[in-house]
Amino acid sequence: MPCHEGLHPLVPNFCTVTSPMNSSHLAPQVQGLYDPQNEHDACGVGFIVQMKGKVSHDIVEQGLQMLVNLEHRGACGCEPNTGDGAGILIQVPHKFIQKIAGAEGITIPAPGQYAVGNIYGSPDPLARAEARQKFNDIVAQEGLKVLGWRDIPTQNEPLGETAIASEPFMQQVYIARPEGLTDDLDFERKLYVIRKLTHGAIRSPKIDTYWYVASLSARTLVYKGMLTTAQVGQYYPELHDPDMESALALVHSRFSTNTFPSWERSHPYRYIAHNGEINTMRGNVNWMQARQALFESSLFGEDMAKVQPVINIDGSDSTIFDNALELLYLAGRSLPHAVMMMIPEPWSAHESMSQEKKAFYKYHSCLMEPWDGPASIAFTNGKMMGAVLDRNGLRPSRYYVTKDDLVIMASEAGVLPIEPERVAKKGRLQPGRMFLVDMEQGRIIADEEIKQEIVSQHPYGEWLAANLKSLEQLPSPGNVPGTDAESLRQRQMAFGYTFEELRILLAPMGRDGVEAIGSMGADTPLAVLSDKPKLLYNYFQQLFAQVTNPPIDSIREEIITSAETTIGGEGNLLDPRPESCRLIELKTPILTNEDLAKLKALDDDEFKSVTLDILFDPNQGEAGLKTALDNLFTEADQAISQGANLIILSDRQVSAEKAAIPALLAVSGLHHHLIRNGSRTKVGLVLESGEPREVHHFAVLLGYGCGAINPYLAFETLDGMIAEGLLVNVDHKTACKNYIKAATKGVIKVASKIGISTIQSYRGAQIFEAVGLNQSVIDEYFCRTSSRIQGSDLGVIAQEAILRHQHAFAPRPGDLHTLDVGGEYQWRKDGEEHLFSPQTIHLLQRAVREGNYELYKQYAALVNEQNQKFFTLRGLLDFQDRESIPLEEVEPIEAIMKRFKTGAMSYGSISKEAHESLAIAMNRIGGKSNTGEGGEDPERFTWTNDQGDSKNSAIKQVASGRFGVTSLYLSQAKEIQIKMAQGAKPGEGGQLPGKKVYPWIAKVRHSTPGVGLISPPPHHDIYSIEDLAELIHDLKNANREARINVKLVSEVGVGTIAAGVAKAHADVVLVSGYDGGTGASPQTSIKHAGLPWELGLAETHQTLVLNNLRSRIVVETDGQMKTGRDVAIAALLGAEEFGFSTAPLVSLGCIMMRACHLNTCPVGIATQNPELRAKFTGDPAHAVNFMTFIATELREVMAQLGFRTINEMVGRTDILEPKKAVAHWKAKGIDLSTILHQPEVGDDVGRYCQIPQDHGLQHSLDITQLLDLCQPAIAKGEKVTATLPITNINRVVGTIVGNEITKRHWEGLPEDTVHLHFQGSAGQSFGAFIPKGMTLELEGDANDYLGKGLSGGKIIVYPPKGSSFIASENIIAGNVCLYGATAGEVYISGMVGERFCVRNSGVNTVVEAVGDHGCEYMTGGKVVVLGQTGRNFAAGMSGGVAYIFDETGDFATRCNSAMVGLEKLEDPEEIKDLKELIQNHVNYTDSAKGKAVLADWEASIPKFVKVMPRDYKRVLQAIKKALEAGLSGDDALNAAFEENAKDVARIGGS
């Protein structure tokens, strides 16, 4: 049945994608590709608490001041005076309430005996009066009494037009506490019930659409709105009343990706303020909704039904988190307990966690999956104030404790001016850790103490031992199915196996336990456009994290991931009992045949399984499939009613008479059927199927609710491959083990791409978009999945299954059972179609070599004429007939080509010759070439020839690996591109195999020759939208003349992300298609991640226009752009600049061997091998000819359509129309109306970029003070010294000065030419990219990203004079210091946060303690840590060396030893160098810790542990060997490379 029918009475309809009424007035509803549900936000959060609970007005004022100092973490939209939201939560100010309510004639009882509510209401007095009366009636029905109402005075003069136009009326209500409610929480529970009832009864078009209860409590009060941080105190003048007293203030500044008004999405919420994003939200909501049917609570009693639905599904992720936390708290758990359930530590592989605590987390994982994602959450109930950080430590949180009992925590240090002598401690929140101030006890309760009290409340370990069963504990049945060799080929055909899948996908999984790696992009048709029957999985594309939240690093940060999961029936979340964990524990969701046999045999009081066939009669077509599904659902209902708590769906009995129901259809259909029935959590779903075999299949099945999967035919296929010699040197058992390992790691990687760390949280999360499925199929079987172009219905799905079945069971001799060739991954005759076929490649190469436009037209015709064979969405579009104009009236080719770019292809992935040819070609035509993420040889910046050519790439890319990103590199850019994602592998980092890291590549990348490089999946300085704004600001400081470009990949919601990018002041946003090329990527990503650019581009343009942001930003697109027609359609959909990658490479000679990752390119393009590079025959003129032909064809189209300029074309979707009479058996159901939608906005709204972004550099410390101060050094190299104050709002200090020095002095200046001494708390990115000759000395503390991209400068940080705390035990600098630093020195007297020296490739530094993930991905430099490190030190470290002063002798337990060895210090020269570094540290910082180490140096030496990358050590030894053999310089390095690169399979130790 459809989503909206037959719902269990306690399970609200959450399948409907949109709510009937948008929560924000004036905000647009769903239209075209825009959907308000895709909005994201991020922010700054902070609190101040008087630890002893003493109330004062000072706390409120300091909270407001803190808010103003977090202004740069919020945002404004198209109006500078309309904020995204800000607010403050305080304790109920009794003195003020008594005074102000008394003036209204309202008698207020004693504190705690009444509640206060701040409520948004309608500006219409009549609607407001009706709403108040309804509220009063409901309160009375619940046995409580309203004491009265008052209007809250507001001042809206400072607000922008948008905020005023949607402004609610602010009102306050008072409710008396009845005598019967003696317990404080009983009163809060009743207020919760009232709030839920009144929301449902009042918030509607009939009464009051503005109605929203910001807070209703006897303890806390919230003032917030669609305000800037400074406007909070202005809008609510009563906040400045001296009687407005509190012992705590929780504040929040919001940054939304949209500009649409939303008063209620501002924070704080009732219990939390949140900085970050919950990545698992879809799954969390699905499971919370599914659990509601089982909710019972002795504390709520009959009121339980009144508070449902618990979750506001139209709210933001923060709203929903607050909803769930509130329920768990009010249903009986303490607030810290509820937080531990929702945001658990990464406990399963924690080497030092107690068994008692692990038992707590394991027990609660049986009740609820983690709410996972980057999060710093502050929480309060008015009596305690706490904060917790996500398991990955992805948001910053710093705190001060003062000697006069104040606790100040915020996203940054320095948000309030505190005299150094008042500070008792400076600290930070740590990953997964909790921080709690209990005002009743008057103290800070440490993480260990809080959690120990909670984990010891029940004997969780005993409960688990008695009830939770592992697969290993289950008895082994005797009969386990094996391989049926005789029918294997026929069954493979029935499930659509191809020979290509065996060879390319399954072989590396079975042989090596790894996913298959491929290269180039996907140029085959979408599943809905293919002539061939496709598996249903292929209609689903993986979504991924970009900008608003980061992907997770499942390789280097494996310690925070988990594949463990449970299956079975859940209990009541609100009434935990020993038997609540009566489940079966799985180490991986991929089951062997033996595992499944154990589950099938279960039949007792604890566990009962039932196996249901998922088969249908192929002769009955669609009706047969529909009937079989309905019968399956009925059988499942019956099984559950008879006590089954495990349902196994099986297609093992497939036969000539019975075809297999597509497994995904059966799993997801049943999952959603059971949710609708309210019985989903009573049962676990297991699949036994011959259909799934690759990572994507498993990921989609798990994402749609499957608990475990037995891919029995894949196991049999591995056996068959061994027998046929396709798999060698491995037996069947090992092959199956390897296969499960590859599949499990692959699924974790897919989950990590969206920022999810555990398979448990990924299950049921539905993080996919359907491309080409009809809405009726979505509503019935895949509720709440986006499917924006419609497409195939159930009839087509049935037809595809039947075609496979008929092909397998057609009468033929047994020896004619041969698998289809495939052709998905490489072009094959009779295989799947490819846009780049041998014919199109040959024609294009002839055309560009001969300069023959007529040959190009033949090539373009083959690509463009997709009437018979559809490939792409643009192939389904036609131009409407319009009055043409003469060709000479169209803007010239030269003007058009200035809009052309080549895509980001790194020096390393392609050869020097190919890379430079593209740069020369694009510079000739006035376009732009892109360095890619591998940096650029500085020699190219000034190279020229007699023709005036230049090899300097106009676009310098900044990717997560920061390879080659220096002050000089950035200074030579016309455009700097931040690579957030790549079309071929969004959510993953770039990858360069070790055999391609030749010495000349390693030199440019500042890495080790022969050692593979994998960039981190996230930018470690971009975990949210406000972080991106910071990097944009940093890079603009590093080169004020360059445009800043942000590269995104098309996915649902990319439009709202692009709006956030525009608000973050990017100059250009690039929306790449999923089909873009790559030098190396998992095949799963190449095929199944991301969406066509047509969808992403259209959504981006529509959303930017709706937000009135389109005129502020250039929109670019790329991805399989091959012809002028492609460019024309891109312009009409909203782009004004265009990128090409694969086609220019083909122009230069690429023949699409798709072996770029192997370094064996036969035409010298995708290789570093000198012998193969010699075969390169390309010429810049070939690429010039290609671009000229594209522009020529485009001009012809423009003349045909009557356009004189590109600007006139941008966004003119009214010129496009779907092709008429599409007869394709699948494509005929496609609806492109959403892509062609035109937003209805006024003529004053720009449709292309016309207004330059205001980067606000004129307000920076560099511009206002430092540039003039340092002019003698910049101009003449003279020494400059100065002392200046600094605060947290002074960001990127020194970077503009550094850029000016670099532009004049490429090699920098002599040491200490500029020496600036700052006093205070430095803002983010202090000293970013500063070159040699600059020294920044900071007396105080620093926030995140200190020394980012340091390019030779020196940074010194130490506590203020007068500080009494011990520096080495306090946080002095924030997270991600020295990210991507390439040269220089840094000395920090104190502790630093997480990810210190991530991707350091040349800086020498001394610090006194570091957080988790220190020296991650480091490739060069020296790091000295004179104290403790966090966990996972040296993960991915392939170069440089670290020295750890290991006083406690346990450093080895916190070091990731995958790529490094731990050694003792023995070399006298090395010991001398180390001592000199520490002595420098003491000299610069006066470090007490450094002095202590040096004071007893001989005793200190044995305590140092040297962390040495094994790859790096091997290279050094090889160089030494080469030098001893008489080689020198580059010859020695090349010899070392040849020696080191013999192990060609290694990729950076992975």
Swiss-Prot record:
<keyword id="KW-0560">Oxidoreductase</keyword>
<dbReference type="InterPro" id="IPR006982">
    <property type="entry name" value="Glu_synth_centr_N"/>
</dbReference>
<comment type="pathway">
    <text>Amino-acid biosynthesis; L-glutamate biosynthesis via GLT pathway; L-glutamate from 2-oxoglutarate and L-glutamine (ferredoxin route): step 1/1.</text>
</comment>
<dbReference type="Pfam" id="PF04898">
    <property type="entry name" value="Glu_syn_central"/>
</dbReference>
<keyword id="KW-0408">Iron</keyword>
<dbReference type="GO" id="GO:0046872">
    <property type="term" value="F:metal ion binding"/>
</dbReference>
<dbReference type="GO" id="GO:0006537">
    <property type="term" value="P:glutamate biosynthetic process"/>
</dbReference>
<feature type="binding site">
    <location>
        <begin position="1097"/>
        <end position="1154"/>
    </location>
    <ligand>
        <name>FMN</name>
    </ligand>
</feature>
<feature type="binding site">
    <location>
        <position position="1156"/>
    </location>
    <ligand>
        <name>[3Fe-4S] cluster</name>
    </ligand>
</feature>
<keyword id="KW-0285">Flavoprotein</keyword>
<dbReference type="InterPro" id="IPR036485">
    <property type="entry name" value="Glu_synth_asu_C_sf"/>
</dbReference>
<dbReference type="InterPro" id="IPR002932">
    <property type="entry name" value="Glu_synthdom"/>
</dbReference>
<dbReference type="GO" id="GO:0016041">
    <property type="term" value="F:glutamate synthase (ferredoxin) activity"/>
</dbReference>
<keyword id="KW-0315">Glutamine amidotransferase</keyword>
<feature type="domain" description="Glutamine amidotransferase type-2">
    <location>
        <begin position="43"/>
        <end position="440"/>
    </location>
</feature>
<dbReference type="GO" id="GO:0097054">
    <property type="term" value="P:L-glutamate biosynthetic process"/>
</dbReference>
<keyword id="KW-0003">3Fe-4S</keyword>
<dbReference type="InterPro" id="IPR013785">
    <property type="entry name" value="Aldolase_TIM"/>
</dbReference>
<keyword id="KW-0479">Metal-binding</keyword>
<feature type="binding site">
    <location>
        <position position="1150"/>
    </location>
    <ligand>
        <name>[3Fe-4S] cluster</name>
    </ligand>
</feature>
<dbReference type="GO" id="GO:0051538">
    <property type="term" value="F:3 iron, 4 sulfur cluster binding"/>
</dbReference>
<protein>
    <recommendedName>
        <fullName>Ferredoxin-dependent glutamate synthase 1</fullName>
        <ecNumber>1.4.7.1</ecNumber>
    </recommendedName>
</protein>
<dbReference type="GO" id="GO:0019676">
    <property type="term" value="P:ammonia assimilation cycle"/>
</dbReference>
<keyword id="KW-0028">Amino-acid biosynthesis</keyword>
<comment type="similarity">
    <text>Belongs to the glutamate synthase family.</text>
</comment>
<feature type="binding site">
    <location>
        <position position="1161"/>
    </location>
    <ligand>
        <name>[3Fe-4S] cluster</name>
    </ligand>
</feature>
<feature type="active site" description="For GATase activity">
    <location>
        <position position="43"/>
    </location>
</feature>
<dbReference type="Pfam" id="PF01645">
    <property type="entry name" value="Glu_synthase"/>
</dbReference>
<keyword id="KW-0411">Iron-sulfur</keyword>
<dbReference type="Pfam" id="PF00310">
    <property type="entry name" value="GATase_2"/>
</dbReference>
<dbReference type="Pfam" id="PF01493">
    <property type="entry name" value="GXGXG"/>
</dbReference>
<comment type="pathway">
    <text>Energy metabolism; nitrogen metabolism.</text>
</comment>
<keyword id="KW-0274">FAD</keyword>
<keyword id="KW-0314">Glutamate biosynthesis</keyword>
<dbReference type="InterPro" id="IPR029055">
    <property type="entry name" value="Ntn_hydrolases_N"/>
</dbReference>
<dbReference type="InterPro" id="IPR050711">
    <property type="entry name" value="ET-N_metabolism_enzyme"/>
</dbReference>
<keyword id="KW-0288">FMN</keyword>
<feature type="region of interest" description="Disordered">
    <location>
        <begin position="925"/>
        <end position="948"/>
    </location>
</feature>
<dbReference type="InterPro" id="IPR017932">
    <property type="entry name" value="GATase_2_dom"/>
</dbReference>
<dbReference type="GO" id="GO:0015930">
    <property type="term" value="F:glutamate synthase activity"/>
</dbReference>
<dbReference type="InterPro" id="IPR002489">
    <property type="entry name" value="Glu_synth_asu_C"/>
</dbReference>
